[in-house]
Regions:
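Short helix-capping and inter-helix turn/linker motifs at the boundaries of alpha-helical repeat units
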Residues: 37, 161, 206-207
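C-terminal regulatory/effector modules of DNA-binding transcriptional regulators
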Residues: 2-6, 69, 200-251
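Alpha-helix N-cap/N′ positions at the starts of helices
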Residues: 41, 95, 118, 140, ...
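Short linear motifs at protein or domain termini
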Residues: 1-128, 240, 244-251
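Hydrophobic residues in alpha-helical segments
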Residues: 50, 126-127, 149-153, 178, ...
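Conserved amphipathic alpha-helical segments that form helical-bundle/coiled-coil interaction surfaces
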Residues: 132-199, 210-218, 227-237
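Alpha-helix boundary/capping and short turn/kink residues
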Residues: 55, 105, 116, 128-135, ...
Protein backbone atom coordinates (compact mmCIF):
# COMPACT_ATOMS: atom_id res chain seq x y z
CA UNK A 1 0.00 0.00 0.00
CA UNK A 2 1.11 3.82 -0.48
CA UNK A 3 3.54 5.09 2.12
CA UNK A 4 1.99 7.85 4.21
CA UNK A 5 3.78 10.49 6.28
CA UNK A 6 3.03 10.19 9.98
CA UNK A 7 2.21 13.24 12.05
CA UNK A 8 5.16 14.60 14.01
CA UNK A 9 5.05 16.25 17.41
CA UNK A 10 7.11 19.38 18.00
CA UNK A 11 10.00 18.76 20.38
CA UNK A 12 9.62 20.06 23.93
CA UNK A 13 12.75 22.22 23.99
CA UNK A 14 11.85 23.87 27.30
CA UNK A 15 11.76 20.57 29.19
CA UNK A 16 14.35 18.69 27.17
CA UNK A 17 16.37 16.44 29.44
CA UNK A 18 13.84 16.62 32.29
CA UNK A 19 12.28 13.23 33.06
CA UNK A 20 8.50 13.00 32.95
CA UNK A 21 6.78 11.56 35.97
CA UNK A 22 5.15 8.19 35.36
CA UNK A 23 1.71 9.79 35.73
CA UNK A 24 2.59 12.57 33.31
CA UNK A 25 3.88 10.01 30.85
CA UNK A 26 0.58 8.13 31.02
CA UNK A 27 -1.59 11.20 30.61
CA UNK A 28 0.44 13.14 28.07
CA UNK A 29 2.35 10.72 25.87
CA UNK A 30 0.37 7.50 25.72
CA UNK A 31 -3.01 8.98 24.70
CA UNK A 32 -1.41 10.99 21.89
CA UNK A 33 0.47 7.96 20.61
CA UNK A 34 -2.59 5.77 20.95
CA UNK A 35 -4.76 8.28 19.11
CA UNK A 36 -2.23 8.44 16.30
CA UNK A 37 -2.08 4.65 16.08
CA UNK A 38 -5.87 4.28 15.99
CA UNK A 39 -6.14 7.00 13.35
CA UNK A 40 -3.49 5.34 11.17
CA UNK A 41 -5.15 1.92 11.52
CA UNK A 42 -8.54 3.35 10.57
CA UNK A 43 -7.01 5.23 7.64
CA UNK A 44 -5.50 2.02 6.30
CA UNK A 45 -8.80 0.16 6.70
CA UNK A 46 -10.84 2.79 4.88
CA UNK A 47 -8.25 3.10 2.13
CA UNK A 48 -8.09 -0.67 1.63
CA UNK A 49 -11.88 -0.91 1.55
CA UNK A 50 -11.95 1.63 -1.28
CA UNK A 51 -9.02 0.17 -3.22
CA UNK A 52 -10.30 -3.40 -2.99
CA UNK A 53 -13.84 -2.40 -3.92
CA UNK A 54 -15.55 -3.13 -0.63
CA UNK A 55 -16.75 0.47 -0.67
CA UNK A 56 -18.35 0.97 -4.07
CA UNK A 57 -17.79 3.94 -6.40
CA UNK A 58 -20.28 6.68 -5.58
CA UNK A 59 -21.19 5.15 -2.21
CA UNK A 60 -22.19 7.75 0.38
CA UNK A 61 -19.91 7.81 3.40
CA UNK A 62 -22.19 9.03 6.16
CA UNK A 63 -20.03 9.90 9.13
CA UNK A 64 -22.43 8.52 11.73
CA UNK A 65 -22.80 5.20 9.93
CA UNK A 66 -19.09 4.94 9.19
CA UNK A 67 -18.33 5.65 12.84
CA UNK A 68 -20.09 2.41 13.75
CA UNK A 69 -18.43 0.46 10.94
CA UNK A 70 -14.89 1.56 11.82
CA UNK A 71 -15.21 2.23 15.54
CA UNK A 72 -13.69 5.70 15.25
CA UNK A 73 -14.75 9.16 16.29
CA UNK A 74 -16.53 11.34 13.75
CA UNK A 75 -13.71 13.89 13.93
CA UNK A 76 -11.15 11.18 13.13
CA UNK A 77 -13.17 9.92 10.17
CA UNK A 78 -13.66 13.43 8.82
CA UNK A 79 -9.90 13.98 8.90
CA UNK A 80 -9.30 10.63 7.18
CA UNK A 81 -11.93 11.29 4.51
CA UNK A 82 -10.44 14.71 3.78
CA UNK A 83 -7.03 13.10 3.42
CA UNK A 84 -8.34 10.46 1.03
CA UNK A 85 -10.15 13.18 -0.90
CA UNK A 86 -6.79 14.84 -1.51
CA UNK A 87 -5.61 11.51 -2.98
CA UNK A 88 -8.62 11.30 -5.30
CA UNK A 89 -10.15 8.24 -3.65
CA UNK A 90 -13.01 10.13 -1.98
CA UNK A 91 -15.06 13.10 -3.18
CA UNK A 92 -15.91 15.82 -0.67
CA UNK A 93 -19.34 17.26 -1.45
CA UNK A 94 -19.35 20.16 1.00
CA UNK A 95 -22.51 20.14 3.07
CA UNK A 96 -23.55 16.91 1.36
CA UNK A 97 -20.67 15.03 2.96
CA UNK A 98 -18.37 12.46 1.43
CA UNK A 99 -18.67 9.70 -1.13
CA UNK A 100 -16.32 7.19 -2.74
CA UNK A 101 -14.82 8.61 -5.93
CA UNK A 102 -16.64 7.69 -9.12
CA UNK A 103 -15.00 5.70 -11.91
CA UNK A 104 -14.78 6.30 -15.65
CA UNK A 105 -12.97 4.91 -18.67
CA UNK A 106 -11.17 8.23 -19.16
CA UNK A 107 -9.95 8.20 -15.56
CA UNK A 108 -8.69 4.64 -15.97
CA UNK A 109 -6.81 5.51 -19.16
CA UNK A 110 -5.18 8.51 -17.49
CA UNK A 111 -4.12 6.47 -14.46
CA UNK A 112 -2.75 3.72 -16.71
CA UNK A 113 -0.81 6.20 -18.84
CA UNK A 114 0.82 7.70 -15.76
CA UNK A 115 1.60 4.27 -14.34
CA UNK A 116 3.23 3.30 -17.63
CA UNK A 117 5.29 6.50 -17.70
CA UNK A 118 6.56 6.14 -14.13
CA UNK A 119 7.15 2.41 -14.27
CA UNK A 120 9.06 2.43 -17.55
CA UNK A 121 11.31 5.23 -16.33
CA UNK A 122 11.96 3.45 -13.04
CA UNK A 123 12.69 0.12 -14.74
CA UNK A 124 15.73 1.50 -16.52
CA UNK A 125 17.27 2.97 -13.37
CA UNK A 126 16.42 -0.09 -11.30
CA UNK A 127 17.82 -2.59 -13.81
CA UNK A 128 21.04 -0.58 -14.08
CA UNK A 129 21.50 -0.21 -10.32
CA UNK A 130 20.07 -3.40 -8.87
CA UNK A 131 22.37 -5.77 -7.00
CA UNK A 132 22.07 -9.44 -6.09
CA UNK A 133 19.77 -8.60 -3.17
CA UNK A 134 17.46 -6.84 -5.60
CA UNK A 135 17.51 -9.87 -7.89
CA UNK A 136 16.51 -12.02 -4.93
CA UNK A 137 13.55 -9.74 -4.16
CA UNK A 138 12.39 -9.91 -7.77
CA UNK A 139 12.60 -13.71 -7.92
CA UNK A 140 10.87 -14.18 -4.56
CA UNK A 141 8.07 -11.76 -5.45
CA UNK A 142 7.54 -13.47 -8.79
CA UNK A 143 7.37 -16.91 -7.17
CA UNK A 144 4.56 -15.81 -4.84
CA UNK A 145 2.66 -14.17 -7.69
CA UNK A 146 3.08 -17.11 -10.07
CA UNK A 147 1.78 -19.53 -7.44
CA UNK A 148 -1.53 -17.68 -7.09
CA UNK A 149 -1.77 -16.95 -10.81
CA UNK A 150 -1.65 -20.68 -11.43
CA UNK A 151 -4.62 -21.15 -9.10
CA UNK A 152 -6.49 -18.31 -10.77
CA UNK A 153 -5.87 -19.87 -14.18
CA UNK A 154 -7.36 -23.11 -12.86
CA UNK A 155 -10.54 -21.26 -11.93
CA UNK A 156 -9.88 -20.72 -8.22
CA UNK A 157 -10.55 -17.03 -7.54
CA UNK A 158 -10.79 -17.40 -3.76
CA UNK A 159 -7.46 -15.63 -3.28
CA UNK A 160 -7.85 -12.90 -5.87
CA UNK A 161 -7.18 -10.13 -3.36
CA UNK A 162 -3.96 -11.81 -2.21
CA UNK A 163 -2.93 -12.32 -5.84
CA UNK A 164 -3.42 -8.60 -6.48
CA UNK A 165 -1.18 -7.80 -3.50
CA UNK A 166 1.49 -10.12 -4.88
CA UNK A 167 1.08 -8.50 -8.30
CA UNK A 168 1.80 -5.11 -6.75
CA UNK A 169 4.73 -6.52 -4.77
CA UNK A 170 6.30 -7.95 -7.93
CA UNK A 171 6.03 -4.74 -9.95
CA UNK A 172 7.33 -2.80 -6.95
CA UNK A 173 10.29 -5.18 -6.61
CA UNK A 174 11.18 -4.64 -10.26
CA UNK A 175 11.57 -0.88 -9.77
CA UNK A 176 12.72 -0.92 -6.13
CA UNK A 177 16.38 -0.24 -7.01
CA UNK A 178 15.61 2.89 -9.05
CA UNK A 179 17.09 5.11 -6.34
CA UNK A 180 14.20 7.57 -6.09
CA UNK A 181 11.98 7.38 -3.03
CA UNK A 182 9.73 10.09 -4.46
CA UNK A 183 9.16 8.13 -7.65
CA UNK A 184 8.40 4.96 -5.69
CA UNK A 185 5.91 6.81 -3.48
CA UNK A 186 4.18 8.35 -6.49
CA UNK A 187 4.05 4.98 -8.23
CA UNK A 188 2.61 3.27 -5.15
CA UNK A 189 -0.18 5.83 -4.79
CA UNK A 190 -0.99 5.66 -8.49
CA UNK A 191 -0.92 1.86 -8.50
CA UNK A 192 -3.59 1.78 -5.79
CA UNK A 193 -5.91 3.75 -8.06
CA UNK A 194 -5.17 1.33 -10.88
CA UNK A 195 -5.71 -1.61 -8.54
CA UNK A 196 -9.16 -0.31 -7.64
CA UNK A 197 -10.21 -0.70 -11.26
CA UNK A 198 -8.70 -4.18 -11.43
CA UNK A 199 -10.66 -5.29 -8.38
CA UNK A 200 -13.92 -3.74 -9.56
CA UNK A 201 -13.59 -5.28 -13.02
CA UNK A 202 -12.25 -8.58 -11.64
CA UNK A 203 -10.00 -8.84 -14.68
CA UNK A 204 -7.55 -11.71 -15.09
CA UNK A 205 -6.10 -12.35 -18.55
CA UNK A 206 -4.83 -15.81 -17.72
CA UNK A 207 -1.85 -17.22 -19.62
CA UNK A 208 -0.84 -13.97 -21.39
CA UNK A 209 -0.38 -12.08 -18.12
CA UNK A 210 1.44 -15.05 -16.58
CA UNK A 211 3.87 -15.09 -19.51
CA UNK A 212 4.40 -11.33 -19.28
CA UNK A 213 5.28 -11.56 -15.60
CA UNK A 214 7.71 -14.39 -16.28
CA UNK A 215 9.33 -12.36 -19.06
CA UNK A 216 9.69 -9.36 -16.77
CA UNK A 217 11.43 -11.54 -14.18
CA UNK A 218 13.82 -12.93 -16.79
CA UNK A 219 14.57 -9.53 -18.31
CA UNK A 220 15.33 -8.22 -14.82
CA UNK A 221 17.92 -10.92 -14.26
CA UNK A 222 19.37 -10.19 -17.71
CA UNK A 223 19.27 -6.41 -17.01
CA UNK A 224 17.44 -5.95 -20.32
CA UNK A 225 15.44 -2.85 -19.42
CA UNK A 226 14.42 -2.07 -23.01
CA UNK A 227 12.65 -5.41 -23.42
CA UNK A 228 11.12 -5.03 -19.96
CA UNK A 229 9.75 -1.62 -20.91
CA UNK A 230 8.16 -3.07 -24.06
CA UNK A 231 6.53 -5.88 -22.08
CA UNK A 232 5.30 -3.40 -19.47
CA UNK A 233 3.60 -1.27 -22.12
CA UNK A 234 1.82 -4.32 -23.55
CA UNK A 235 1.02 -5.57 -20.06
CA UNK A 236 -0.73 -2.36 -19.04
CA UNK A 237 -2.41 -1.50 -22.34
CA UNK A 238 -3.89 -4.96 -22.90
CA UNK A 239 -5.30 -5.01 -19.37
CA UNK A 240 -6.84 -1.56 -19.80
CA UNK A 241 -8.37 -2.58 -23.13
CA UNK A 242 -10.03 -5.56 -21.47
CA UNK A 243 -11.37 -3.44 -18.62
CA UNK A 244 -12.69 -0.72 -20.93
CA UNK A 245 -14.49 -3.26 -23.13
CA UNK A 246 -16.07 -5.01 -20.12
CA UNK A 247 -19.31 -4.37 -18.30
CA UNK A 248 -17.79 -2.38 -15.44
CA UNK A 249 -19.41 0.85 -16.65
CA UNK A 250 -22.90 -0.65 -16.87
CA UNK A 251 -23.07 -1.81 -13.24
Amino acid sequence: MTSQATKSVAPDTENRGKPLSRAAHRTQVVPAAEASRVSETTYRRVRADIVYGRLAPGQKLTLERMRGAYGSAVSTLREIFNGLASEGLITAEGARGFEVAAISADDLREIAAMRQLLECDALRSSFESGDVEWEGRVVAAHHKLATLEKRMSAGDRSQEEAMRRYDWAFHNALISACGSRLLLDMHAQLYDKYLRYLMLASVFRGEPVTVEHRELRDFALERDWRSAQAVTVTHIQDCVAQMVSGDLWQR
